[in-house]
Amino acid sequence: MGRPRKDETTQDVRERLIVAMADRLIREPASAVTVTSLIKEVGCNRSTFYYYFADTEQLAEAALDAVVPVEIPRALLSLIRQGAFSLSPATPNIPDLVQRNAQGIDTLCAVLNGPNAALAQKRVKRRLLEDVLPDLGVSLSSNTDDPTSRIVFEYATGGLLALMAYRAETGFAYPVETFLHCLAPEVPAALLDVLSEKR
């Protein structure tokens, strides 16, 4: 596959394709999105598209990966290691991370409330399984492959993804901080207790 045209910078075109796909995922089924419509919207040629992505399915995965705020759970795990676990917005750095990831969080909420909810749930869980769950095992000195860890993980992520979809359903009537205040620290602490007691 040939390289993109000289006037199409690598980072710029790839990012524009990802942003365009993320917007499409909010409004229409991923299966309905075509390469032709995407390259017309972004203003690149077909060769450029295939230089970066094998197909629209791979682009959809990249678009979802781009809006998963993995920095936030990683920061929370860091607090676990320090013995100061909290989901409260008053916790140092957490408000900054929420603000920094605000656009991506809003996009993910909207996708989870749209025609690609199942696709988004599957991809987000996979990212968290790969990037966050292993760190949780290290923090708690536990085996993340055991049934208890997976059950708690599925329960926690399923609930959070449902809340994100609900936030979009309300027309984004509530800021992320409202959900954090409501859940913390009791809910995450209770789940951590389950993992600690049954590992």
How does the language model describe each region?
Residues 34-35, 63-76:
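Short, basic, alpha-helical segments at the C-terminal edge of helix-turn-helix-like DNA-binding modules
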Residues 24-58, 62:
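Helix-turn-helix
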